[in-house]
UniProtKB/Swiss-Prot annotation:
GO terms for biological process: protein import into nucleus. Residues 76-120, 141-167, 201-294 are annotated as: Disordered. InterPro entries: FAM53. This is Protein FAM53C. Disulfide bonds: none annotated. The modification Phosphoserine is found at residues 122, 162, 232, 234, 255, 273, 299.
Length: 392
């Protein structure tokens, strides 16, 4: 079986495998004239185009549609309705063949966006004209609510007041958010947070009932849902931005405090600009400040600085040269105190000689200790004059 297939494939040539394109026109079976449409299965050569074929106008239905099948796909041809046709046919033809719009009626493209919208990637081009009203943090600049009651309801209690009073009653925007517009008017729902924060005066105020906690709004304020939009934080400088400035009646007692404010900052002075408290202490800026009289530097006493500390060798030589009989305390500890001639008995010359010998031994012993340790002063005591010590 395989050999037969391979032999047949070898006999075929590339010319026999040339592809042909078919164009099929399907007329209605009850149509009499088939010459206009051609044969039901018409073979067209590859070089011929389907656009050159005669147009088949026989596939006409009662709803004024014309169908003709071509290799490029199913094309739908419409003919204008006759004046005697039924209104259903006219309405169908108007739906299927809309009139081309006039160039004068086309909407004017919006102006190029400002730099603020060029920087913000969250604002698309078609919504560049829609500027949200920018409001700062809602805890600082709310105007005081006069009728503030403690209710048992779960929903927010908002006073229902007229628009010209301009107190903080929550109302919808003129172009409210998509989630608030899409909700039906008969079903109550809780208001989204950004619709409360971006509330604006409108002709149809809406209020929240404290018992049920629902959010009611008029059906007239609900319009078809606009495309969703992400809110950008860039403030818009429009004519509506001035109405949300802080009022003169605002006080620290009227506006609620932030719950996350530290306890130490509650006694700071209240100001609109909230200046930084650390501006007066600029650590990075070096300036010439006047010296603080409370922190005076201690004056230098040069007399005390010129006084040399007691050095044993020098003082010993100086006292020896001056002929004074005062010996240093550490030398007194090394050797017994010498007895002068006035203290010794008159007839005891032998005792005086023996004491002088002890002085010599004590001085030599002290010189050896000073040479070995050199802890009291770094001076060489090898050149000490022992005769002066003996005379002393």
């Amino acid at each position: 079986m395989i050999t037969l297939i391979t032999e047949q494939l070898q006999k075929q040539t590339l010319d026999e495998l040339k592809c042909t394109r078919f164009s099929i026109s399907l007329p209605l079976p009850d149509h009499a004239d088939i010459s206009n449409c051609g044969n039901p299965f018409q073979l067209v050569s590859e070089g011929a185009s389907w656009r050159g074929l005669p147009h088949c106008s026989c596939a006409e239905f009662q709803d004024s549609l014309n169908l003709s099948y071509h290799p490029s796909g199913l094309s739908l041809h419409l003919r204008p309705p006759s004046p005697g046709s039924s209104p259903q046919e006219q309405s169908l033809s108007q739906v299927l063949s809309p009139e081309p719009p006039d160039p004068e009626k086309l909407p004017v493209p919006p102006a190029p966006p400002s730099k603020r919208h060029c920087r913000s990637l969250s604002v698309p081009v078609d919504l560049s004209r829609w500027q949200p009203v920018w409001r700062p943090a809602p805890s600082k600049l709310w105007t005081p609510i006069k009728h503030r009651g403690s209710g048992g309801g779960g929903g927010p209690q908002v006073p229902h007041q007229s628009p010209p009073k301009r107190v903080s009653s929550l109302r919808f925007l003129q172009a409210p958010s998509a989630s608030s517009q899409c909700a039906p008017a008969h079903r109550p729902y809780s208001p989204p947070f950004f619709s409360l924060a971006l509330a604006q005066d409108s002709s149809h105020p809406s209020a929240a009932s404290p018992q049920s906690g629902s959010w009611e709004s008029d059906a007239e304020s609900l319009s078809p849902c606009p495309p969703q939009r992400r809110f950008s934080l860039s403030p818009s400088l429009g004519p509506q931005a001035s109405r949300f400035l802080p009022s003169a009646r605002s006080s620290p007692a009227s506006s609620p405090e932030l719950p996350w404010r530290p306890r130490g900052l509650r006694n700071l002075p209240r100001s609109r600009s909230q200046p930084c408290d650390l501006d007066a202490r600029k650590a990075g800026v070096k300036r010439r400040h006047e010296e603080d009289p409370r922190r005076l530097r201690p004056s230098l006493d040069f007399d005390k600085m010129n006084q040399k500390p007691y050095s044993g060798g020098l003082c010993l030589q100086e006292t020896a040269r001056e002929g004074s009989s005062i010996s240093p305390p550490w030398f007194m500890a090394c050797s017994p105190p010498p007895l002068s001639a006035s203290c010794s008995p008159i007839g005891g010359s032998s005792q005086v000689l023996s004491e002088s010998e002890e002085e010599e031994e004590g001085a030599v012993r002290w010189g050896r200790q000073a040479l070995s340790k050199r802890t009291l002063c770094q001076q060489d005591f090898g050149d000490l004059d022992l005769n002066l010590i003996e005379e002393n």
